[in-house]
Amino acid sequence: MVVPDLDDVTYDLEVDGEQVRRTLHRRVFERGGWATVAIAFEERASDGSWKPAKLALIRLQRVHEAWKKHAALTMAGTDALALGRALVEWGAAFDGNVDE
């Protein structure tokens, strides 16, 4: 995947005119020549209902005048929530307030 702008990174998917994956939330984290796009999404089950939400993390690198996909990771919603809770617990470390 190569896109000219980070706004062009999408995760929606249609098959034969039917939406089978839809984006619920999206956030871009950009620093220097690297960006991470976090996307909460749902996929359609075979019975037509929507499955529980998942998280996709897409890592992109700036190459000349475009963004090139470098890596991607998909997590179940429960795993994404567990990761979020862990990050909150570790918050002091990210703020530089770790007791030694």
Regions found by a protein language model. Name each.
Residues 1-100:
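Positively charged, low-complexity terminal tracts
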